[in-house]
Every structure is written in structure tokens, then in C-alpha cells.
């Protein structure tokens, strides 16, 4: 098993110059001091893993560089990881029903955006909750969510960083609401709230861009009701678009990387798993796979 030090040394650890303040390679003296203090206090408390600059700076940014609050957040995260089984979830959890779930709730990663981020697509408008409940449970869906987060952290982002030549810390999300009604939008937003809770508290500062496309009339009004539950920084990264979204997406995602169904030029052979199951990106390219190895799969195509 590869050591944490070897793993971190295998891909860039600095973001490009001019990235957001407080990111690796873009810190001032006060932020460096806070980073040093946080690491010292966590080491004194007995923590030995996940104390690298990138991780600690994410927790500090999430708490506006308040060391005490960042420490509390980190400690709560580590407690959750232990209780939820997060550290071993990639080995322990198998989502063999995913090919069936994908028919009623399409969720998938597909290539990268112009900043090198992995792009995650979620077709909420195609969700059929009645059929999904026959296949899986909410508990397993949440396990799947955490499994995917761990895959992003341990496989997708490192590979994307190697491909980009600099540290890639965040992902780009496209959530398609085509076909959804305003009456069911509230249940969709409820899911977003639950997913955001896990993201904000246990995977802070991982959202780069978040596009809600094909948003129905009145969706923005409904979304405002949920804003109080979301961190303001998170809200600033969310873009709500109607049916004329292609030009905005293409500003962020190269046409050759954007699936054709969303106005791009990327096509996937069904024999390779199709768009929903192929999982195409640097993390599946031998040139960018490091000592961690290729990302495991949570289901079998056989």
C-alpha cells in the first residue's frame, strides 16, 4: 500500500498563480501562520493523517482562516470518517445495482473542464423515485455518494492534477433538471441540501462550478428558500440556467469534452458502458495514474 507521503509527492501540490487566495501557492503571511498553527494543534491532539497543506487550507478557507473553527471542523470530519467507515468504503462498498440505478437516476463523471476539473453530471430531471426504491435504498445511495467523493479525492483529482500540471482541488458539476416539474423541484432541492451538507462539512472547498441547467420556471424562487441552508461561498459558485444553457457550459467545458446530449461533441460507445457507466477521464488514462493505481469500480459490468 502506497504511503501518504509517496502519494502526495506523485502529483502537483500548488495551484496556479492567481488562483483563489488561501489556496496552495497563493497564501499570504497570515494564512501561512494559521496553517502552521492548525497543523501544530492537530498533531498535538494526536492526528497523523490528512495534515498536508491542501487539506488543511481547505478547512481553513471553509472557516475563513479561524484556526479554532477549522480545527473543530477537522475533528468532526475525522470522527465522522471513523463512524461512517469512510476510510475503507472504497474497499468495503460495492454498488452492483448501479447499472440499474443509472437508468432511473443518471449520475456520472465525464472528462474535464477548461481548468482541468473532473466534470460530474447528474440528470435529476430523469429521476424515477418509484422505480429506484425497488432497486436500492436511501442508505446505499448515500454510501454511493461518499464512495464517489473518496474516488474524487484519491483518484480523480490526483490524475487531473498530473494532466493539468498543477494542483486541481475542485470539480465542476452539471445538474440537468430537464423534465422536472416545479412541484417535484422541492424534493430535488431537498436532495441537494443533503448532498451539500456532506460536501460542506466533510469535503469542504471541493466545489469549483455548479451549473443547474434546464431549470423550470420558478426554480430560482424555490432555490432561494434553501439558500439559508447553504454556505454563502457555495451559493456564489452555483449558476441557474434555463434551456439556453449551451453557450454558458461551453465557456467552461471544451466542446470535445462535453457530451453531445448537452451540446458538445463527446460521444461514448455503448459497448464501453455508454455515457452513464464509462467513467472517462484522466483517472482512466495510464499516463496520469500514479502510485495509487487505477480507481476501483463499485460495480461489475459482467
Swiss-Prot record:
Keyword Membrane belongs to the record: yes
SMART domains membership: CRAL_TRIO_N, SEC14
Top-rank taxon, per record: Eukaryota
GO molecular function: phosphatidylcholine transporter activity; phosphatidylinositol transfer activity
The protein's name: SEC14 cytosolic factor
Organism: Candida glabrata (strain ATCC 2001 / BCRC 20586 / JCM 3761 / NBRC 0622 / NRRL Y-65 / CBS 138) (Yeast)
InterPro entries from the UniProt entry: CRAL-TRIO_dom, CRAL-TRIO_dom_sf, CRAL/TRIO_N_dom, CRAL/TRIO_N_dom_sf, PI/PC_transfer
Annotated Pfam families: CRAL_TRIO, CRAL_TRIO_N
Function as written in the Swiss-Prot or TrEMBL entry: Required for transport of secretory proteins from the Golgi complex. Catalyzes the transfer of phosphatidylinositol and phosphatidylcholine between membranes in vitro.
GO-annotated biological processes: ascospore formation; Golgi to plasma membrane protein transport; Golgi to vacuole transport; Golgi vesicle budding; negative regulation of phosphatidylcholine biosynthetic process; negative regulation of phosphatidylglycerol biosynthetic process; phosphatidylinositol metabolic process
Coiled coil (UniProt feature): none
Domain CRAL-TRIO, residue spans: 97-270
UniProt cross-references to PROSITE patterns, sorted A to Z: CRAL_TRIO
Compartments in which it is found: Golgi apparatus membrane
Keywords of the record: Golgi apparatus, Membrane, Protein transport, Transport
Statement: the UniProt record of this protein carries the keyword Protein transport: yes
Membrane topology annotation: Peripheral membrane protein
CDD domains for this protein: SEC14
GO annotations of cellular component type: cytosol; fungal biofilm matrix; Golgi membrane
